[in-house]
Amino acid sequence: MSDIIREAVTQLQSKIGTFDGSVKFVIEDEGSIILDEEGAREGDGDADCTMSADAETFRGILSGDVNATAAFMSGKLAVDGDMGTAMKLGAALS
């Protein structure tokens, strides 16, 4: 597991814990994370929603320095799947 993935899993666990639904985060050139009712973990399974971004954007979203909606609107964050799940996660991260 890369340091970026490890750090992101730790931050998601402390910030959100568990999540009603499933989201996969794909961090370019690093790997992917699943967040669901079991918590956050490294993984590459099916999810209701998939969010893809580079490591810098993902770190900024987790730290609160980057607004997820603004990242999506500017093309730095790609979302595929259930937009309702993505919006629910965005609210949980803010």
Give the residues covered by each predicted segment:
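Feature captures hydrophobic
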Residues: M1-S94
